[in-house]
């Protein structure tokens, strides 16, 4: 019965693909307290996945804004942060962090079978650790940032965990302050771009030689807009075409690199977005961001501005290339 249901769903999705039905401009999340943080998209099922700081749940929003709980942790005190879909292998990768039951953070990297909704892999990063964001390369290898330590981890198909890259530049300025945050692999598949939240910085790490680390320099708008409270530090990031989009609480910056060394970028900025942003992803050839209110609630001690939403980000906000 379950197999037949999956076949029916697949057939329906094939029809939708042929009709080229566009995704909604905005998705509204029902929760009023979850603080959704990470965002990922599955192109096979036309589904968004939103992780949550509160409640230990991962939410799935399918076409036509149908919302359901994809996964509920047996421990509601854990937080889920970064998320990434490996569509080829039908896996949703998520960072799980526990900062509520122990003053020393500990975290795991989890993988879920998207079609079965089952937890299939779990890799413990140890203590202390703060898994913030993650991505995969063409071979399915996972790369994850640690906001508490100056490390980028690599996880292979055998779930073997190793420190892929480490540098004093990546270290938090003091305990409890976020260090490394969002990351993504460049379109050429040879470089990893990763942001540090405090102080704001962007680094290029060679995938072939992780000791080859360069801090990216900028022209155009100032990176992270020093002194502007809408830009408390970079969070999620995503390549869309040859441009890298970096998300802040109250703005987004578009970075266009001068060449494939990915060591210099021209920056353009928009603040024509709601405050509360944390993550960004590509869905059906469009950019979407999640309005989660994490900075407002966690760092400013204020109530969230509801509702939580996933909404389209139009690249035209940055002007012509």
Q: What spans do the regions from the language model cover?
A:
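A short beta-strand motif characteristic of beta-propeller blades
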Residues: 23-29, 67-73, 118-124, 162-174, ...
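Asp-box/WD-like beta-propeller blade repeats and closely related beta-sheet repeat scaffolds
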Residues: 105-139, 145
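Short, conserved, GDST-rich strand-edge loop motifs in beta-rich repeat architectures
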Residues: 95-105, 292-306
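Short loop/turn segments that connect beta-strands within beta-propeller blades
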Residues: 62-66, 113-117, 156-160, 206-210, ...
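C-terminal motif of bacterial Sec signal peptides marking the signal peptidase cleavage site
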Residues: 15-18
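Beta-rich, blade/repeat-based domains predominating
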Residues: 31-46, 53, 74-100, 125-142, ...
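Short loop/turn segments immediately following the C-termini of beta-strands
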Residues: 53, 97-99, 147-149, 197-198, ...
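A short loop-to-beta-strand structural motif that recurs across blades of beta-propeller domains
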Residues: 57-59, 108-110, 151-153, 201-203, ...
């Amino acid at each position: 019965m379950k197999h037949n249901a999956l076949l029916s769903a697949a057939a329906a999705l094939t029809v939708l693909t042929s009709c080229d039905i566009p995704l909604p401009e905005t998705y509204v999340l029902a929760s009023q307290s979850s603080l959704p943080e990470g965002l990922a998209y599955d192109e096979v099922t036309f589904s968004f996945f939103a992780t949550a700081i509160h409640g230990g749940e991962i939410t799935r929003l399918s076409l036509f804004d149908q919302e359901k709980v994809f996964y509920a942790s047996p421990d509601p005190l854990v937080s889920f942060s970064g998320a990434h879909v490996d569509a080829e292998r039908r896996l949703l990768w998520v960072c799980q962090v526990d900062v509520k039951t122990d003053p020393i953070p500990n975290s795991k990297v989890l993988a879920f079978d998207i079609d079965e909704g089952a937890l299939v892999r779990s890799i413990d990063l140890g203590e202390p650790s703060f898994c913030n964001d993650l991505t995969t390369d063409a071979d399915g290898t996972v790369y994850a940032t640690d906001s508490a330590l100056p490390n980028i981890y690599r996880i292979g198909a055998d779930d073997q965990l190793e420190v892929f890259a480490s540098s004093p530049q990546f270290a938090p300025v003091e305990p409890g302050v976020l260090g490394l945050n969002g990351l993504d692999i460049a379109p050429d598949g040879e470089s990893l771009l990763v942001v540090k939240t405090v102080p704001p910085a962007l680094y290029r790490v060679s995938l072939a030689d992780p000791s080859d680390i360069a801090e990216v320099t900028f022209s155009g708008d100032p990176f992270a807009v020093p002194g502007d409270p809408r830009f408390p530090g970079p969070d999620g990031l995503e390549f869309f075409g040859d441009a890298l989009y970096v998300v802040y609480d109250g703005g987004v910056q578009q970075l266009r690199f001068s060449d494939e060394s990915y060591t210099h970028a021209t920056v353009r900025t928009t603040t024509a977005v709601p405050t509360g942003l944390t993550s960004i992803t590509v869905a059906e050839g469009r950019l979407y961001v999640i309005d989660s209110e994490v900075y407002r609630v966690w760092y400013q001690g204020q109530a969230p501005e509801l509702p939580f939403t996933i909404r389209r980000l139009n690249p035209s906000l940055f002007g012509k290339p």
